[in-house]
Amino acid sequence: MTRLDANFIPNLNDGISSERVVFRGNNYRITVLSERLLRLEYNPNGHFSDYLTTLVANRNFSVPAFKVEQDDKYLMITTNYFMLQYIKNKSFVGPKFAPDNNLRVTLLNTDKSWFYGQAEARNFKGGASSLDDFDGSVKLDKGLYSTDGFVMIDDSNNLEIDASGGLISPDKDKVDLYLFMYKRDFGLCLKDYFTLTGYPELIPRYALGIWWNKERIYSSEDTKLLIKAFNRNKIPISVLLLSEFWHIKDKTNYNLYKTGFSFNKDLFPNPSEFTTYMHERGIRVGLNIDPSEGVRKEEDRYKFISDELLITDGVTIPFNVLDKNFMSLYVKHLIDPLLSLGVDIFWIDYKKDLNVLNGIDYYYNKDFTKVINNRPLILTRSPLVAPHKWGILYSGQTPVSWNTLKFLPFYNSLAANKGVTWWSHDVGGYKGGIEDSELYIRYVQFSCFSPIFRFSAERGVYYKREPWMWDIKTFTIAREFCLLRQRLIPYLYTEACNYSKLGRPLIQPIYYSYPEIYDEPNYKNEYFFGKE
């Protein structure tokens, strides 16, 4: 059996809180992590886990100030922010006529209290997994910001990280909640959140430049011509993303096989030469990865994996993020060879189960920690669970429309409610709709003042994302804002450093400073772009 490298092994002490802040009974365990943060666990079988999860990176907080009163039946914990009242060993779910009977947490000096199952209707939301096929509305996930002054995050069903660094399923009977009770101190709530989940990594400086992607069948020579066109038109480019056609395909039908891990040698006969060519020109290379179809026998490293798994009949090896042996082979034989070839960015385009997506993002990011001479990162759909940890988020294949563009500034500002900065949207929209020079220009202008600036569109000559493909007026304006984006990179990188060290998002909604204007439509699409 293949083992994961040492960089995967977690520090188990990070998952254990001081005994001074833990209160437990046969079926419950309550932990006071900070003056504003509680961990609430209930399990009818009495089992409680200290393993870290895809959400939680640390529970070893400094011991906060609090007061506890308890007897055989009741537990009451008070801090400067809240008072918890609990009937010991009772289910967190109270009776229908009094849902807060068993467990209630009250914000001090307010009329507001939380109980398990509460709707939290005043939550300001924090984003979605993707905006694929956006039609003017989308179901938004809960954020941290709430005019109630509290929010609960449920960690019950998230994957756990065992002592080897592999992922395992959680106990299906457990309830494992994190309750933030912060009143109006949202900045301190974010600090607690990042202490719990991990502070954001500092993204590479190149990621703040201009990205290019088009869903077309590029060859190595095609990409060189593309870069020459950017240079000829005096438009900077920092990242080249290749869609699924970079990898081995069925030669009779290029639309088959969304999954692949080996370069198509007909298009890229020398992958290392291709990445070197780009790196010498200051351009980083990203590849589209969707592992959902498994590992086919045509892959360069198939035999290494199949031999280890004792597979002899050439069948496709299914992808299983919970199979530690398979995932260790996946890392060793599918991720690492691409890193060795000079690939900088892995565009995780997995569209199914969010828990699996979380696991995929975990394995890639953890593997990157052993890389010394490069700073690889992932571009991923949001797994919703602590998405700030996983690099840069990709909002999916958005429609070409004014409705989409109108929604995106509001969507950017929502991200801060979940501690997220690095959202990436398709400049111009990705698919459908009607191409319009005015719409294109407005997208470019918006993207200049967005976290990530990424041109992207599906196949077909109909979609013009190259600024030089438009009329001279559109081209001139688009180039002007591309150059402005380039000049903004030092400012953006300073803000990226502040985000990584201090947890201060690049984009913040106006209502953080002026909460009374939240419902004013004139301000809905406005946000602060950095501290200045």
Report each predicted region and the residues it spans.
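A low-complexity, Ser/Thr/Gly/Pro-enriched, surface-exposed linker/loop concept
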Residues: 8, 33-72
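Carbohydrate-binding surfaces of carbohydrate-active enzymes
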Residues: 2-24, 31, 229, 233-234, ...
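Aromatic-lined carbohydrate-recognition surfaces of secreted/lumenal glycan-active proteins
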Residues: 211-213, 242, 283-296, 348-352, ...
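Beta-sheet entry/capping signal
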Residues: 29, 37-38, 74-76, 83, ...
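Aromatic-lined carbohydrate-binding/catalytic grooves of carbohydrate-active enzymes
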Residues: 201-354, 388-389
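Catalytic and substrate-binding clefts that recognize carbohydrates or anionic sugar/phosphate headgroups
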Residues: 62, 68-207, 213-215, 220-222, ...
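Glycan-recognition surfaces
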Residues: 300-333, 339, 363-469, 501, ...
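Generic, well-ordered alpha-helical scaffold segments in large soluble proteins
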Residues: 192, 196, 226-229, 233, ...
